[in-house]
């Protein structure tokens, strides 16, 4: 009788251990499944891109999503000299300028400050040493160009190693790159651009340049043009952005 009792207790303990082991295995499998099924967090770049819109590839990859324009700026474009030329395409009668005339031109370059911001610097230096001279690097490191605007880095395109920035204010707002020079606005008696009646009409992208057509409305004082009597002057403008040669690159590394 004693032998039978001991065998029964031993059998009972073995079954209990098996149930515990099976429970542990089941919990482990459930935990692994939960890890696999956890969705990947969407990046800021993916959030913007999934909205669709138009994509144009050239000097920069340009995205037109809803009413905003974005550039994808690769690291290879940082420090490159870019020429921005603004011309009148349509003007009021007796305005003092004619369609086709150049309004102004500016040379600028992009500089990455950190992971959140790209600076736009206007190149205004007039003292340039000869290429290869020792003084050239010293001159570039001891002088500084003005920051005319900044671009917030919204996201990053891992495939092209490019930074996504919104450029709508660059072409629509009171931007130093595309706005008329202060001296010209003074002579034409123009005030600040009116945001609600200033538009980006088209943006066309090519391998070496980008062409932007805008309609710009300025507050105006009484001038020689009859249109100024309304308090506003509306202009048709074309902005041409193109890269300069490789020799014209601003030195940004020590």
Q: PLM features: residue spans?
A:
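Auxiliary tRNA-acceptor-end handling modules of aminoacyl-tRNA synthetases
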Residues: 12-254
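Bacterial Sec-dependent N-terminal signal peptides
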Residues: 1-16
């Amino acid at each position: 009788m004693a032998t039978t009792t001991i065998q029964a207790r031993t059998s009972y303990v073995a079954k209990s251990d098996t149930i515990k082991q099976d429970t542990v295995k089941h919990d482990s499998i459930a935990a692994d499944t939960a890890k696999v099924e956890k969705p990947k967090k969407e990046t800021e770049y993916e959030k913007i891109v999934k909205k669709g819109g138009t994509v144009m590839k050239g000097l920069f990859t340009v995205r037109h999503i809803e009413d905003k324009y974005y550039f994808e700026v690769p690291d290879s474009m940082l420090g490159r000299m870019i020429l921005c030329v603004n011309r009148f395409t349509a003007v009021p009668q007796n305005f003092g300028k004619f369609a086709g005339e150049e309004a102004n031109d500016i040379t600028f370059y992009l500089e990455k400050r950190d992971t959140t911001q790209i600076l736009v610097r206007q190149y205004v230096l007039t003292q340039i040493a000869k290429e290869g001279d020792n003084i050239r690097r010293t001159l570039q490191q001891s002088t500084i160009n003005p920051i005319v605007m900044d671009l917030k880095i919204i996201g990053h395109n891992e495939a092209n190693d490019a930074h996504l920035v919104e450029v709508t204010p660059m072409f629509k707002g009171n931007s130093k790159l595309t706005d008329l020079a202060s001296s010209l606005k003074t002579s034409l008696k123009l005030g600040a651009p009116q945001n609600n009646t200033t538009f980006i009409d088209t943006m066309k992208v090519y391998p070496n340049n980008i062409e932007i057509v805008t309609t710009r409305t300025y507050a105006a004082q009484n001038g020689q043009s009859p249109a100024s009597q309304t308090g506003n002057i509306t202009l048709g403008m074309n902005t041409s952005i193109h890269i300069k040669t490789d020799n014209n690159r601003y030195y940004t590394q020590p």
